[in-house]
Amino acid sequence: MCLQIGGGGMDLRGQTFTLEGVAASLLILLAVYTIFQSTVVIAPSWSDYANVQLKQLGYDILRVFDSDGGNSSLKGAIVNCSSGFKAPDEFNANLSKILDSLNAFGKVELIWVNGSKIESHALYGFNKTPTPDAVRVSRFVVVQDLNNSECFNLTTPTTKVVEVRLTLWRT
């Protein structure tokens, strides 16, 4: 049965099927995007299969620490670091426990733009020299107010984006 509007013979079912198709394609795109954001994609020609698990664990570590968990979060470590780039004790203890359970070592670097130059510093306690087969993962953290932080000698009081770079390796 067709619904006729004004005698033109327009079928509203066609429009309904088009909208369903658009909604289904958006849902599929969202699912594919989510899958590729949460996993490491391995190309068949990639020869470094041994470090894939360590790299995925690195992404997971940064994802876990990127929460509103006070001093034990990435944002808390950035805002509340003391001079010499020493992160709060809660952050250091939690990251050390995770690295010990993985039998891995880690280096944590903070990278940010200060005026017209890019600055980079490693966190105290996580500043060892990595081995050549180390893997590196990073996450960007938006921090609203870094003026009170002892670690950042900022010339501008605006919101900052800090890259937290985690380098992992096993011996």
Curated annotation (Swiss-Prot):
It is found in: Membrane. It comes from the Archaea. The chain crosses the membrane at residues 21-43. Its main location: membrane. This is Uncharacterized protein AF_0762. GO terms for cellular component: membrane. It is a single-pass membrane protein. Keywords: Membrane, Transmembrane, Transmembrane helix.
